[in-house]
Structure formats: structure tokens, C-alpha cells
């Protein structure tokens, strides 16, 4: 199980939102490339980037910063989410050196788009499912749909989606602990590996997720916890490697 540091980009800065609210953000760094260096130095093997402006505008806004990080660390697998709604955007990021793109809102509203993109860019497509009480939320979490997250996962099973980033939005950025049961339910709904996101606070969460990792959980994204120091990224990864 990989520990995946998150760098959330807003107006070129590295921030964290609480429950996805753009006006409730904390700036952690105005140099995202240097921020990435900190996690690389601690041994991170994958980086999770989010273009927050892009998620709300539906097109890349912080693409220049993403490209700069990818160029600075060419051997590091990077996944990017936020505002990915077209083949042109996916191509832009992959050519910039990003390994995987995360399709969120469009995956819910237009599942055929995921099917098509998996064919066009095999092995590079991740689906981001953000859920509240099991129901999928879209458009930067502004809308909650009538689609169940587990049903959508089953739909993408045949498409060749490389993984699902599953976020429990009630817990994201709140430091209240990860929703292990909801993550396990998602992992067992399909054969697609699941990356847990939202609410990871300390080693207790890592231990709880790792204990269930054999059910299909391949990674854990952490943001606020590693920035505020309640979780040590290197220690968490060492624990996952040893157990």
C-alpha cells in the first residue's frame, strides 16, 4: 500500500480545503515544486496533484505548476485531478510527463467518456469517486447525484480503469479519521484497486487501512495530516512496507 502525498493547487499555491470549500482553505506553501521535493526526499513513490481551480472551472488552470513538478521529478509517478473533462486535457498532461489523470465529474455525468479515454490512453486513466453517504458528488462537490459510488465502480470494471480514488467528502480535510468501512465496501464492489482519500489523520488510520488492504486497497492519499505533522509520511510508508 502506497502513502501518496497530496498537493492541492489553488492560484499557483499549495493549499488544503476543508470539505471541498474553496473559501475555507489553508495555504501551506507558495512553492509547490519545493513542496514536492519535501515528499520526494521523504521517499514518496507517487504524488497526487489536484488543480482546485480547474475542478471548479472545468479546464486546467494550474497546468504550468503541474508541468513544472513533472519536469523536476521525471522518475516520479504523478496523478492529476481537477478539471479533466476532455481528451485534449488528458493528452496535455500525459505529454507533460504526468503518469495518470483522474476523471471525476465527467465520469459520473458521462461514463462513456471513461470508456473512450481508457481506449485512447490505456493504463493512464484513474476514476475519482467522491461520495457522501455512498452517493457520488460532482462539480467540486457542489452537487450530490443520485448515483451510488459502488454501482459506478462496477460500470468501469470492464473499461481498464487503473484505479479508483475514493474520497469520503464528509471527512476530507477534517482530520476526523478515515472511513475504513466505506473504503472497503468500494474496494469489494469491483476488481479495480482503490486508493483511499479523505480523513486520514494519523498512524491509526494507516494501520486500519493496511489491515484491510488485501481486500483491494492499494494506496492512501494524505494531505492535511502530513502538512500539520500528525502523520509522518516516511514512517507511514515504512509501516506499510513492513506489514
From Swiss-Prot:
Keyword Amino-acid biosynthesis among UniProt keywords: yes
Q: Where is the active site?
A: 8 (proton acceptor), 130 (proton donor)
The subcellular localization recorded is: Cytoplasm
Keyword Membrane recorded: no
Q: Give the EC number(s) under which this enzyme is classified.
A: 5.3.1.16
Annotated Gene Ontology cellular component terms: cytoplasm
The principal location of this protein is cytoplasm
Task: Extract the PANTHER family matched here.
Answer: 1-(5-PHOSPHORIBOSYL)-5-[(5-PHOSPHORIBOSYLAMINO)METHYLIDENEAMINO] IMIDAZOLE-4-CARBOXAMIDE ISOMERASE
Q: What is this protein called?
A: 1-(5-phosphoribosyl)-5-[(5-phosphoribosylamino)methylideneamino] imidazole-4-carboxamide isomerase
Q: What species was this sequence derived from?
A: Cellvibrio japonicus (strain Ueda107) (Pseudomonas fluorescens subsp. cellulosa)
Q: Give the lineage.
A: Bacteria, Pseudomonadati, Pseudomonadota, Gammaproteobacteria, Cellvibrionales
